[in-house]
Amino acid sequence: VELAYYSDLAVRLVNSEEPARGTDSLTSVEAVRALFGESQSAARRATDADVTRLRSVRARLRAVFEAAASGDEVLAVDLLNALLIEFPVSPQISGHEFRDEDGRPKWHMHIADYAANAGAGYAATASMGLAFHLTELGADRLGICEAPPCRNAYLDTSTNRSRRYCSDRCATRANVAAYRARKRLDAERSASPPRRPSSDRPDRGARTGRTADTAHDSIPATDR
């Protein structure tokens, strides 16, 4: 199965909207067709109705990423299973369009869908691709960008599971913001007067000019 291609369909759809910034690029049938990328035969089936269909699927796929990113693997799996049930696929062996250097077919598993419309077909392949990614690499490989205000989804393919941002641009922006925050904190600490150690502070008797002994001596004998 072309894991990277199919799972990327889910990321592409989720990131067509940036809720924190109030932007949404999925507004026309042309935008729907652009999501399909190389699958032009499927893209040609798209209609205006698929805009609404895919927006609904997009919200559900984002919920999968959000659940996985928060550590709730069970919820992520349940949400994804619901999509797989609603949008089934049929795996097939394919390879006629790919040839090796000797001209022989490069056989591979292909996710075929028989959906009634382009939106359902996209949902089927995107959901199955994400399911393969989750089961093969782990739910913790599904992430949400940690560089506010960005909330883009991403698939972590790093060797040490260390990815935290959707892009190099967001990673750089987050690092710069963290650096500036540290510099501000250092400046605030430098501007504050140092606190005197408790050992250097005069005791109450010293502040009043009286020692414990003189205070004792001033008490009338009848009160002692």
Which positions does each model-derived feature cover?
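Short, glycine/charged-enriched secondary-structure capping and boundary segments
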Residues: 159-161, 181
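Cysteine-rich micro-motifs
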Residues: 161-171
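Short metal-binding segments enriched for Cys and/or His
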Residues: 174-184
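Short helix-coil boundary/hinge micro-motifs
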Residues: 1-144, 148-155, 188-224
